[in-house]
Each structure stands twice: as C-alpha cells, then as structure tokens.
Amino acid sequence: QLVTHIAEDYEEGAILVFLPGMGEIKALHDRLRASLYESEHRAPSSVRTEDDDDDDKKKNSPPRYLLVPLHSTLTAEEQKRAFSKPAPGVRKVVMSTNIAETSITIDDCVYVIDAGKVRETRFNAKTRTSSLETAWVSRASAKQRRGRAGRVKPGYCFHLYSSKTEAEVLEDFAIPEISRAPLDALVLQIYSLGFTDPRAFLSKCIEPPSKMAI
C-alpha cells in the first residue's frame, strides 16, 4: 500500500525498499505485480519488467512500474538493472537487501522504505552451531538507509517501525561479523599464514571475538 501510495501521489523518482532477504523480496515483488494488475482495473502492461517495450505509452493512462529485485546472489549484469533509467511515466521500484546500504548508490532514488530488519549469520559458541537469523538493524544502518534517499534531489524515508522502537530496541551499531560468525575458516587462514597462536592474533582486533568462540 505504501509503495502504491508513493507511486501515485508523490513526484517522480525511484523507490528503494529495504527488506531482510530474498524470500521477502520475492514475496513483495509478487504481491506488487498482483495488486498493480488489479488496481483500478489496470491492464498487465501497467507493470513492466526490464524487457517490456515503451511503445504503448498513452496520455492519462495509469502509471506503470519497473520492479527490480536486488541482492548479492544476482550477477553483476543483473544488478545493473537497478541503475537503469525508466521511461517517462514509469516508476522504478527497487526491492533490496542491505546491499544497497553502502555498497551501491542508486542515483535516481528519491524514496526509501525501510522495513528495519536484516538477515545475518549468527554463531552460538556454546552449541557450536550457526543459524541465519532475522534481526533489527542498528541505528547506524537505519541512518545509512535514510541517506540513500535524495542523492540528487530532496528525498523521503519511511521507516516501518516506531520512533519508540528506534530509541529502545535498536542498538547504536551492528554486531561486528567477527563476533557473530563462525571462526573456523579464519583460524585456519591464520595458521596458513604462519602464525601459531590464533588467540593472540585475534586479540589484537579492534573488537576481538570471545575466547570461547575462538
């Protein structure tokens, strides 16, 4: 509903939606296609993909949409679609993981919708198991996401959580990967470089992992 509201009631500009992972991206992509097809009895041509033609533009017709998923498993060529310029009257909607926080910049992004969640690997040193968990973003990440809006003109950011949640639930910064991911490969790499004590080596990190994790 928010994507549709922005697309129909706000000035032109791409919409960037931050989601935790590929499952949520696909779900939103499918729901947007379905709702846009049905909305105001629009024809399927009102939702377009990268391969659709631009020849069917009509004056006073409902706005059309370019729906673009964006995540790290896409090829470089597929990721380029997020930077494509849509035709006049076409609203680009990029549905992305946190890859769009800092790694890339979508110049024509004017609107950001932030779900406030991220999916990341967490390691339990006691059980020696890893799991992929969905967690709240940090305030620093929320600020980064907010900064993606309005790179070339004033923009808007819609956070899908309350200011109370931001103040009381979100941490200032994300947990460093070295403190939440399994260290097996890293320890082996330290040995392969000729170091004999990975505990001493890792203790010199800016934010060293726990001794139990090592």
Where are these predicted regions, by residue range?
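P-loop NTPase motor module signature
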Residues: Q1-I214
